[in-house]
């Protein structure tokens, strides 16, 4: 009888775990990772608008480096306080605070451990896919779908814009490890315009 009661308690806790709690638990499985990705941007009708590739490094909490190599190179780096967006083609770097970035894109949620970050979102789960949607009063209008296994392995994510345009990112390699701290520093190259929005 005792075993049955314990089993029921365990099943109840599993059944009633919130999708947000489950996603947070999975994200907390590893402290960092490195991955290569492919990107495909689709129109609302499903036509391929763009394809690209790059690599990402995340060190939780708050550190990430997102490097898109093709079709147009750009780099997004944060040291946990400042986020730099560098576009070599236009020779410009934009700086903003990490909290500002969190309110503009749910991707930053992958890197943080701050419970209040989730206040602007609702989370739904379908297997290993978690749909992170902005609440009605949020300034964010895009939906974010992260695909993450119970082990914490992120296999990819998608961003669905309000107009139906979709960007799919699939991780072609994934290595759970702590990237070197030096990956999360950025030095503004000479001759580059600076747009400081902090």
From Swiss-Prot:
CDD domains referenced in this protein's UniProt entry, alphabetically: LolA
Localization terms from the record: Periplasm
Top-level lineage group: Bacteria
Signal peptide boundaries: 1-17
GO cellular component: outer membrane-bounded periplasmic space
An annotated GO BP: lipoprotein localization to outer membrane
InterPro entries xrefs: LolA/LolB/LppX, OM_lipoprot_carrier_LolA-like, OM_lipoprot_carrier_LolA_Pbac
Chaperone recorded as keyword: yes
Swiss-Prot/TrEMBL keywords: Chaperone, Periplasm, Protein transport, Signal, Transport
Coarse class of the protein's main subcellular location: periplasm
Alphabetical list of Pfam families matching this protein: LolA
Annotated S-S bridges: none
Subunit (UniProt): Monomer.
General function of this protein: Participates in the translocation of lipoproteins from the inner membrane to the outer membrane. Only forms a complex with a lipoprotein if the residue after the N-terminal Cys is not an aspartate (The Asp acts as a targeting signal to indicate that the lipoprotein should stay in the inner membrane).
Family: Belongs to the LolA family.
Name this polypeptide is given: Outer-membrane lipoprotein carrier protein
Organism this protein belongs to: Aliivibrio salmonicida (strain LFI1238) (Vibrio salmonicida (strain LFI1238))
Lineage: Bacteria, Pseudomonadati, Pseudomonadota, Gammaproteobacteria, Vibrionales
């Amino acid at each position: 009888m005792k075993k049955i009661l314990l089993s029921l308690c365990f099943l109840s806790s599993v059944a009633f775990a919130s999708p947000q709690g489950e996603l947070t638990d999975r994200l907390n499985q590893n402290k960092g990772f490195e991955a290569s990705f492919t990107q495909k941007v689709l129109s609302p009708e499903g036509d391929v608008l763009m394809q690209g590739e790059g690599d990402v490094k995340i060190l939780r909490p708050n550190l990430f480096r997102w490097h898109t190599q093709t079709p147009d190179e750009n780099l997004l780096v944060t040291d946990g306080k400042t986020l730099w967006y560098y576009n070599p083609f236009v020779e410009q770097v934009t700086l903003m605070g990490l909290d500002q970035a969190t309110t503009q894109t749910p991707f930053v949620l992958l890197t943080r451990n701050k419970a209040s970050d989730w206040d602007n979102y609702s989370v739904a789960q379908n297997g290993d896919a978690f749909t992170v949607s902005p609440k009605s009063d949020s300034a964010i209008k895009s939906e974010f779908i992260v695909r993450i296994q119970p082990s914490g392995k992120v296999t990819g994510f998608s961003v669905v814009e309000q107009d139906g345009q979709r960007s799919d990112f699939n991780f072609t390699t994934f290595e759970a490890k702590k990237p070197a701290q030096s990956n999360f520093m950025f030095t503004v190259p000479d001759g580059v315009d600076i747009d400081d929005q902090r």
